[in-house]
């Protein structure tokens, strides 16, 4: 109140009532915030994909087309060193390296599943190509890397190369390899399974100098314009991943291919072992029981998967021996005590890992949710030899109905 002359002014302040947000309004607000964050994440991810696409086939980049594969491979080593990824690759990743023509992805998937079943922490898997989303190439503990982690690693790799190192981005697959090393390093990967992209000797994944174990899956004629037009030449390129004093395993090969692998083994100075084959009834190739009373029912269909699963078993055993993994070694020793005469020891953890293996797009059956009469049979192949087992798998399922 204030007096002015003969008038008295009275000021009345009306305080607003405290605003009360209804619980439903709070939920709606939080949902809107989440939707906004998700939309932003999707937009950021799409931007990454657009930038990544520029590295395909030298698109929008001034890269000389006459740079040899050897020179590109040497340069990639420089990227690994300059990005400070060498220590992780050689010391922390405990890599399993797999080359071959047929069954590389399936073999790697079997390895991943068996390792996870044996409680190995932070198992990384680098494969190619992807089926739907590029993040499928970077699996951590059986799942594709998250979009947020992908985005962070992508921009770190790209900006470090361009802005700090003042170097050009490598082409698509090589860039993805560097990106993968960053992703797996940040995830604290303790075992990194590397699937060769093409060939072996000059493949980006062959930047690893000290893997724990290497392998060559079934060989055939593929990429003859790059690798050579005979099985001997192709086998020689695939065997380029062999390392001195690192045990190498191979699936059974035709004599011509085996001769090249043996020759490379002598040149490098390593041991080469043909993987012993397990039968789906739980026996090895000599009829000895491999552990457990139940049959080994592989998670991937097709009789040819026995070859890939057998190779994966050998790789995991050798990996455990080289890394001194107590859990796996204990399982193997326990099984040996139960079956001292068995030549091929297959603990229950290995059997369960083989059974749980999943690899989208490989002998996969998808039934339409909206139609009971529509079923999709999915498989992939890039050579005539690879198409044959896929066709046999499809025929077996259809004829069984």
Segments from the language model and where they lie:
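Extended acidic/charged loop-beta regions that coordinate divalent cations
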Residues: 129, 179-226, 258-297
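Nucleotide phosphate-binding/pyrophosphate-handling subdomain across enzymes
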Residues: 191-194, 203-215, 219-220, 233, ...
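Conserved beta-strand/loop subsegment of P-loop NTPase cores
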Residues: 213-217, 245-250
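ATP-dependent carboxylate-amine ligase catalytic core
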Residues: 41, 62-73, 77-95, 117-209, ...
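Hydrophobic beta-strand scaffold residues
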Residues: 123, 248, 271-273
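Membrane-proximal helix-turn-helix segments that form the acceptor-binding/catalytic region
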Residues: 235-243
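Intrinsically disordered, low-complexity terminal segments enriched in Ser/Thr
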Residues: 1, 6-14, 334
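N-terminal leader/targeting and accessory segments in enzymes
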Residues: 15-102, 106-119, 247-249, 256
């Amino acid at each position: 109140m204030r007096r002015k002359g003969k008038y008295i002014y009275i000021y009345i302040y009306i305080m607003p009532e405290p605003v009360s947000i209804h619980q439903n309004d709070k939920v709606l607000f939080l949902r809107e915030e989440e939707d906004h964050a998700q939309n932003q994440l999707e937009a950021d991810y799409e931007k990454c994909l657009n930038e990544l696409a520029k590295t395909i086939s030298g698109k929008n980049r001034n890269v000389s087309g006459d740079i040899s594969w050897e020179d590109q491979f040497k340069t990639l080593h420089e990227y690994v060193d300059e990005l400070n990824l060498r220590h992780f690759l050689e010391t922390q990743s405990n890599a399993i390296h797999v080359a071959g023509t047929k069954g590389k992805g399936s073999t790697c998937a079997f390895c991943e599943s068996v390792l996870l079943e044996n409680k190995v922490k932070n198992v990384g898997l680098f494969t190619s190509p992807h089926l739907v989303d590029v993040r499928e190439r970077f699996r951590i503990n059986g799942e594709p890397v998250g979009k947020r982690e992908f985005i962070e690693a992508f921009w770190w790799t790209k900006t470090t190369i361009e802005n700090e190192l003042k170097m050009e981005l490598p082409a698509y697959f090589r860039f993805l390899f560097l990106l993968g090393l960053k992703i797996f390093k940040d995830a604290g990967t303790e075992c990194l399974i590397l699937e060769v992209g093409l060939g072996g000797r000059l493949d980006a994944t062959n930047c690893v100098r000290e893997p724990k174990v290497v392998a060559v899956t079934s060989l055939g004629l593929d990429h003859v314009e790059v690798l050579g037009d005979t099985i001997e030449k192709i086998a020689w390129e695939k065997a380029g991943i062999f390392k001195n004093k690192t045990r190498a395993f191979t699936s059974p090969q035709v004599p011509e291919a085996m001769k090249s692998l043996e020759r490379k083994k002598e040149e490098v100075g390593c041991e080469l072992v043909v993987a012993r084959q397990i039968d789906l009834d739980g026996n090895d190739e000599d009829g000895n029981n491999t552990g457990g009373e139940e049959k080994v029912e592989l998670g991937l269909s097709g009789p040819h998967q026995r070859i890939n699963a057998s190779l994966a078993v050998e790789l995991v055993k050798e990996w455990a021996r080289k890394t001194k993994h107590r859990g796996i070694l204990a399982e193997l020793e326990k099984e040996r005590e139960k079956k001292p005469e068995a030549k091929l020891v297959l603990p229950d953890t290995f059997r369960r890992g083989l059974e749980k293996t999943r690899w989208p797009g490989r002998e996969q059956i998808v039934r339409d949710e909206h139609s009971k009469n529509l079923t999709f049979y999915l498989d992939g192949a890039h050579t005539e030899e690879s198409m044959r087992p896929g066709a046999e798998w499809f025929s077996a399922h259809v004829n069984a109905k």
